[in-house]
């Protein structure tokens, strides 16, 4: 019996050491309660995924399309290309693009955004493609935030664009109001998931990140817009310009770096 007790104590000590190790890796701006809850969530994810969480990744390793490596652009930048966007950038058709194969990886933003956030924590996971009948298709119908929980396990609630408009006494969004909204709801250092509707119709789930120096950056995990990608003009100002004037209640912002991931949605990732 004493031996069994000793073995059990050893297992508990090992578990606590693992939790302490994970907590030590986390950003200082998270609270003690948040760190402990995330560490326990990591253990739950390790058990479900049957892989070990690695060391936290920096922004470059988590981003630069590493969260969605199977994404292929239909058009690629080419100064002599015959296609142009509204900004005058020239493109040519990508000969490597295959519509049937590649479309699922251009409509999977609802997994790219959490994949980026979890990669920052040290999870070497990537986004699956969005195909009919998948959990990803379920999330893409206005349910993107359902993958996140508060530290007490309750469903996380986003700050909807509509509730912010009502609070401000505004009737609709404008580019200036989008900037005001982003700066108000993404005030603290951290990682935020944004669900936004486009002026042209449709919508998108993506990332806004507030850094220690005060910068608010639009990070696009689905298709690279980082410095040097040629697409860095897709910035926060760009989001403000193409955001819809009116939105469904599912549109808004949720801080996610201090949230728990619902393990029932882990099959939206490849490992």
Regions found by a protein language model. Give the residues of each.
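Active-site or metal-binding loop neighborhoods of secreted/extracellular toxin and effector enzymes
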Residues: 169, 175-271
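Long amphipathic alpha-helices with heptad-repeat character
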Residues: 1-12, 19
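Glycine-rich short-loop/terminal segments
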Residues: 12, 18-188, 195, 254, ...
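Non-Sec secretion/translocation targeting segments of pathogen effectors
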Residues: 1-3, 109, 271
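Residue-level marker of positions within ordered structural domains that often coincide
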Residues: 1, 114, 213
């Amino acid at each position: 019996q004493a031996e069994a007790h000793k073995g059990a104590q050893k297992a508990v000590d090992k578990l606590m050491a693992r939790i302490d190790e994970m907590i030590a890796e986390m950003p200082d701006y998270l609270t003690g309660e948040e760190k402990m809850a995330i560490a326990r969530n990591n253990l739950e994810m390790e058990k479900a995924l049957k892989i070990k969480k690695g060391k936290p990744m920096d922004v470059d390793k988590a981003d630069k399309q590493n969260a969605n490596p199977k994404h292929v652009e239909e058009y690629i930048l080419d100064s002599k290309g015959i296609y142009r966007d509204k900004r005058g950038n020239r493109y040519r058709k990508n000969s490597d693009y295959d519509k049937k194969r590649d479309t699922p990886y251009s409509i999977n933003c609802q997994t790219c955004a959490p994949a980026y956030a979890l990669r920052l924590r040290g999870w070497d996971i990537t986004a699956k493609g969005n195909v009919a009948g998948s959990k990803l298709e379920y999330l893409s119908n206005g349910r993107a935030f359902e993958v996140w929980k508060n530290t007490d396990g309750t469903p996380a609630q986003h700050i909807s664009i509509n509730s912010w408009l009502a609070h401000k006494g505004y009737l609709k969004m404008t580019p200036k109001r989008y900037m005001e909204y982003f700066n108000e709801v993404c005030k603290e250092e951290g990682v935020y998931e944004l669900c936004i509707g486009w002026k042209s119709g449709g919508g998108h789930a993506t990332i806004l990140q507030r850094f220690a120096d005060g910068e608010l950056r639009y990070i696009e995990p689905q298709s690279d817009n980082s410095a040097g990608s040629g697409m860095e003009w897709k910035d926060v100002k760009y989001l403000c310009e193409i955001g819809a004037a009116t939105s469904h209640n599912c549109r808004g912002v949720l801080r996610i770096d201090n949230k728990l991931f619902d393990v029932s949605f882990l099959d939206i990732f490849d490992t």
